C-alpha cells in the first residue's frame, strides 16, 4: 500500500487516496451477479409516460445486496418512495453497498443509464467508499478533488488495467450522461456518520471540506441542483443528542437502522421540497398535518398525555363497561390549568405503539412543560414475530435482535421492553416535557390472599428503565 501511494504521488503527481475512516468491510461486490439480479432493471417500474426517480448511491442508500434489512441495517432509499405520489412518479433504488463513485460508474452505471428517459430524475449520493488503495484490495478509491487528474493503474490481484479519475470527474460524468438523456440530475452530499467533533462535542462532523464540497462544486459547475443531505440530517442529530443518535445506526457508525434511514429519507425530501423552483418537489405527497393530537391545548397551559394499552384507554363509553384509567384521570386535574389527552390504544405493547406511529404523533405535539404518563407491560410478553407479533426482548438493557416477521415478510430489529420505555422517556425529555413512568395496573389474579405483582419482570424492567435516565417511576 505504501509503495502504491508513493508511486502514484511521485510518478503521476496525484494526491494520495482518502483514508478509510469507516473501517467497515462490505463484501457486496464479491457477488456481482447476485447484485445485478437483486436490484431493479432500470426503467422497469415506469407507469405509462410517467417519469422515474432513479437513486444512485452506496450502502447508506441501499444496505447490502438485497437491501431488505436482514442485518438490521437499512438505507434511506428504501423509504424514499413513501414520500412521492406513486400515481405520478415511481422511485427505483439502484444503490449498492460497497460502491464508490468510481466502481459504480464503471460497473453499474451503464445498466442504469440505459433505463433513463427524457424527463426522469437521477439523485446521486456517493463518496463514503471513495477511499483506500487505488490498485489493490477493493480498488475503489477516486482521486481526491474535482480536477482532471488521472492515474493509470494495474489492479494487483487481477492484472486488469484501469484509468482512475478524480471524485469530481466521476460526478461530472454522471451529470453529463443524465443530461444527454434529457433527464435531470441532482447531487446530494453524503449521509452523516455517527461521528462527533470530539468526545465532548455536540457537533456532528460534516463533509463540507471534502466530498460535500466537491459535489457542490460540480453541481455549480454543471448548473444542476445540490442538496446538502449531510447538513440537514446532522442538524437533526445534534438536536437529538448522542444517546438518541446511537440507535440511528446499527452495528457500526455509518450504516443506519430503520430509525436513521427514515430520518435521512425525510431529510432528503425536505431538501427537495425546500430547493427553490425544483420541479421534482411537485411529485411529493402533501405533508400530512395531525390536527388532533395536542388540540386540547389551552394558551399558556401544559397538556398531560397518557400512553399505554387498554388499561389506560378502553371503550370508555358505557358506565357499566370497561374503562381505562386515562379516560377518568381528567377528573383529578384542574381543567383551567391543564388539559388531558388520552393517546393510549387497546392491545398495544410499547413496541407496537411505536411501530404504528402512535408515539410519533405524541412526540410531534409535545411542548416544554407538558407531561407524559407512560404505562405498558400487559401486552409485551407475547410472540415477537408470529401471531400478534407485539412482544419485545425481556429486560431493560440495550440488547436487540433481527427477526423476520411472519405476517409482513419483512425484517425488523426488536429491542428490550425497557429500551422502548427509555426511548419514550428520552424523546419526551428532548422536547422539554416531563415523562412519568408507571408500572402496569394489577390484574385480578391472586396468590396466597394477595394480588400477584410482576415485580420481577415488567415491574422491575419499568423501574430500571426510569432509573437509567433518572426519571420518576410510580408503582401502580
Regions found by a protein language model. Give the residues of each.
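Conserved small/polar residues in nucleotide/adenosyl-binding loops
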Residues: 1-4, 472-475
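Serine-esterase "nucleophile elbow" of acetyl-processing enzymes
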Residues: 22-95, 111-122, 141-143, 294-345, ...
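Solvent-exposed loop/turn segments at secondary-structure junctions
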Residues: 59-63, 96-102, 128-133, 191-195, ...
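Histidine-centered active-site loop/cap adjacent to the catalytic His
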Residues: 91, 123, 246-294, 340, ...
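Oxyanion-hole/transition-state-stabilizing segment in secreted/luminal serine hydrolases
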Residues: 105-165, 354-412, 443
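Substrate-gating cap/lid alpha-helix
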Residues: 192-229, 442-474
Amino acid at each position: 500500500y505504501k509503495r502504491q501511494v508513493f508511486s502514484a504521488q511521485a510518478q503521476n503527481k496525484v494526491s494520495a487516496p482518502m483514508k478509510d475512516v469507516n473501517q467497515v468491510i462490505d463484501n457486496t461486490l464479491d457477488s456481482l451477479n447476485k447484485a445485478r439480479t437483486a436490484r431493479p432493471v432500470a426503467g422497469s417500474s415506469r407507469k405509462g409516460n410517467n417519469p422515474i426517480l432513479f437513486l444512485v448511491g452506496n450502502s447508506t442508500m441501499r444496505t447490502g445486496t438485497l437491501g431488505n434489512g436482514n442485518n438490521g441495517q437499512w438505507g434511506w432509499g428504501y423509504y424514499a418512495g413513501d414520500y412521492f405520489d406513486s400515481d405520478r412518479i415511481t422511485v427505483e433504488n439502484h444503490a449498492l453497498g460497497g460502491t464508490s463513485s468510481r466502481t459504480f460508474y464503471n460497473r453499474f452505471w451503464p445498466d442504469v443509464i440505459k433505463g433513463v428517459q427524457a424527463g426522469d430524475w437521477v439523485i446521486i449520493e456517493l463518496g463514503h467508499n471513495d477511499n483506500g488503495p487505488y490498485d489493490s484490495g477493493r480498488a475503489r478509491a477516486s482521486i481526491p478533488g474535482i480536477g482532471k487528474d488521472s492515474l493509470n493503474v494495474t489492479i494487483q490481484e487481477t492484472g486488469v488495467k484501469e484509468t482512475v479519475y478524480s471524485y469530481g470527474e466521476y460526478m461530472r460524468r454522471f451529470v453529463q450522461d443524465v443530461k444527454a438523456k434529457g433527464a435531470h440530475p441532482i447531487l446530494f452530499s453524503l449521509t452523516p456518520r455517527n461521528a462527533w467533533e470530539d468526545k465532548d462535542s455536540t457537533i456532528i462532523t460534516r463533509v463540507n471540506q471534502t466530498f460535500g464540497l466537491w459535489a457542490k462544486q460540480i453541481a455549480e459547475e454543471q448548473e444542476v441542483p445540490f442538496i446538502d443531505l449531510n447538513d440537514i440530517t446532522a442538524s437533526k442529530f445534534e438536536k437529538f443528542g448522542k444517546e438518541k443518535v446511537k440507535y440511528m445506526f446499527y452495528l457500526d457508525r455509518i450504516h443506519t437502522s430503520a430509525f436513521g434511514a427514515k430520518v435521512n429519507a425525510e431529510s432528503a425530501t425536505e431538501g427537495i421540497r425546500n430547493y427553490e423552483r425544483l420541479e421534482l418537489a411537485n411529485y411529493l405527497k402533501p405533508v400530512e398535518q395531525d390536527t388532533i393530537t395536542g388540540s386540547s391545548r389551552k394558551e399558556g397551559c401544559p397538556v398531560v398525555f397518557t400512553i399505554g394499552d387498554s388499561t389506560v384507554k378502553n371503550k370508555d363509553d358505557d358506565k357499566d363497561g370497561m374503562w381505562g384509567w386515562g379516560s377518568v384521570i381528567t377528573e383529578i386535574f384542574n381543567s383551567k390549568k391543564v388539559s388531558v389527552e388520552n393517546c393510549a390504544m387497546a392491545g398495544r405493547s410499547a413496541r407496537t405503539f411505536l411501530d404504528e406511529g402512535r408515539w410519533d404523533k405524541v412526540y410531534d405535539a409535545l411542548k416544554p412543560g407538558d407531561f407524559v404518563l407512560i404505562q405498558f407491560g400487559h401486552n409485551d410478553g407475547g410472540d415477537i414475530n408470529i401471531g400478534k407479533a407485539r412482544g419485545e426482548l425481556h429486560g431493560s438493557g440495550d440488547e436487540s435482535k433481527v427477526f423476520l416477521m411472519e405476517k409482513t415478510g419483512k425484517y425488523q430489529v426488536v429491542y428490550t421492553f425497557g429500551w422502548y420505555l427509555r426511548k419514550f422517556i428520552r424523546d419526551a425529555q428532548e422536547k422539554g416535557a416531563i415523562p412519568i413512568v408507571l408500572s402496569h395496573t394489577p390484574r385480578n389474579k391472586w396468590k396466597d390472599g394477595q394480588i400477584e405483582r410482576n415485580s420481577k419482570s415488567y415491574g422491575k424492567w419499568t423501574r430500571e428503565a426510569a432509573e437509567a435516565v433518572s426519571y420518576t417511576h410510580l408503582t401502580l
